[in-house]
Amino acid sequence: SIKYIKKGDKMDIKLFDSELAVMNVIWEHGDITAKEISDILKESIGWNINTTYTVIKKCIAKGAVERREPKFICHALITREEVQKASVDELSKKMFGGSSELMFASLLANRSFSKKEIDNLKKMIQEYED
C-alpha cells in the first residue's frame, strides 16, 4: 500500500510499505542511526543491512528523512499523523468519492466495536461538535 507524505504544503510523495517500515522505526525511536534501524528491521522482519540502507536512501531522496552526520543519523521530516491523515484522505477520495460519512459508515458496518470503543467514538464526535 502507498502512503503520502508532505512536500511543501501538499502531500504528494508516495511512501511504499517498505519505506513505511523504516519510518515507523524512526517515529518510534526518534533520531536514530541507520545501523540501529538496520538492526531493528533485521530482528523484526529479517531485512539485511543492504536492503535497509537502500530503503533509507529512498526515504531521503523522497524528502521523508534527513541524513545527519556523524554516524548517518536519520531524522524524520514528516510525522506519523501527517502520513495517517493523508492516507485517510486518499482512501476517502479513492473509495468513497471523498465522502467521510460514507467511509465512516463502511467502517461501522464492517467491524464490531467494544462498548468502550463506541463510548470513545461518541465522545470524539461530541468534542468535534462543540
Predicted features by range, described:
Residues 2-25, 82-83:
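Short alpha-helical segments that sit at the start of domains
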Residues 13-18, 70-89:
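Short, cationic-aromatic polyanion-contact patches
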Residues 15-18, 31, 97:
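Short helix-coil-helix linker/hinge
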Residues 22, 53-60:
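Basic amphipathic alpha-helical segments that dock to polyanions
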Residues 32-41:
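Short acidic, hydrophobic short linear motifs in intrinsically disordered regions
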Residues 60-69:
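A short, conserved structural fragment
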Residues 88-129:
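Amphipathic alpha-helical dimerization/coiled-coil segments
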